[in-house]
């Protein structure tokens, strides 16, 4: 996968990167509630399932912002030209999950075809990583459809330079005539600030509002 190198000598976040990578090693998690009322209406018109559609929308938003596509490669900070989703699928019979990956395509129908092909091939494979090694240029998506939450955090230890974002969805919430989806966004502070997380969330909300436009 192609990528762009970041020149740390001229990068406007070089001080922030050094601080949160070397001195105050930290990430942060931000949980919000997306209004998916319009999106659920669109689902009825398209015939698509909710989970893969959200995987598509999150991947689409990620691929608009370099902050969510960063990694260390050969000890250099880079951002991928494109990031592809790694998503979890649940196995009821074993009460375990697998992590699968499919390629991101800007075209929704093309993405859905790829997603459906991957899930059909591995739907009965209960290994954690049925496809083997995950792509380097990945983002992480999972869902907890059994429970709603107002906050969610993963405590990642032992890999201070893991910059791929983690997105976790929860059970819908009904508030009046609106349907809300709790979504947690977890990032490494070395490459992403609150501003970037907020911009991502606002972009994702616009995509949910205008999926058919």
Curated annotation (Swiss-Prot):
Disulfide bonds: none annotated. Keywords: Acyltransferase, Antibiotic resistance, Plasmid, Transferase. It catalyses: chloramphenicol + acetyl-CoA = chloramphenicol 3-acetate + CoA. GO terms for molecular function: chloramphenicol O-acetyltransferase activity. Its EC number is 2.3.1.28. GO terms for biological process: response to antibiotic. The active site is at 189 (proton acceptor). This enzyme is an effector of chloramphenicol resistance in bacteria. Type II chloramphenicol acetyltransferases are sensitive to inhibition by thiol-reactive reagents. The inactivation occurs as a result of chemical modification of Cys-26. Belongs to the chloramphenicol acetyltransferase family. Homotrimer. This is Chloramphenicol acetyltransferase 2. It comes from Escherichia coli. The gene is cmlA.
């Amino acid at each position: 996968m192609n990528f762009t190198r970041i020149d740390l000598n001229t990068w406007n976040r070089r001080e922030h990167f050094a601080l949160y990578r070397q001195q105050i090693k930290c990430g942060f998690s931000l949980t919000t509630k997306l209004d998916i009322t319009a999106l659920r209406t669109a689902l009825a018109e398209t015939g698509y399932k909710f989970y893969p559609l959200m995987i598509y929308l999150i991947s689409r938003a990620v691929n608009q912002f370099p902050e969510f596509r960063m990694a260390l490669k050969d000890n250099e900070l880079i951002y991928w030209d494109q990031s592809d989703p790694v998503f979890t699928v649940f196995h009821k019979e074993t009460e375990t999950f697998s992590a699968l990956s499919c390629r991101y395509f800007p075209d929704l129908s093309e993405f859905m075809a790829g997603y459906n092909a991957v899930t059909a091939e591995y739907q009965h494979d209960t290994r954690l990583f049925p496809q083997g090694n995950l792509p380097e240029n990945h983002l992480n998506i999972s869902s907890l459809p059994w429970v709603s939450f107002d906050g969610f955090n993963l405590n990642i230890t032992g890999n201070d330079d893991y910059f791929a974002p983690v997105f976790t969805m929860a059970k819908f919430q009904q508030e009046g005539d609106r349907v809300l989806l709790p979504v947690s966004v977890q990032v490494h502070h070395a490459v992403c600030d609150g501003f970037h997380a907020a911009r991502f969330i606002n972009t994702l909300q616009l995509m949910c509002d205008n999926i058919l436009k």
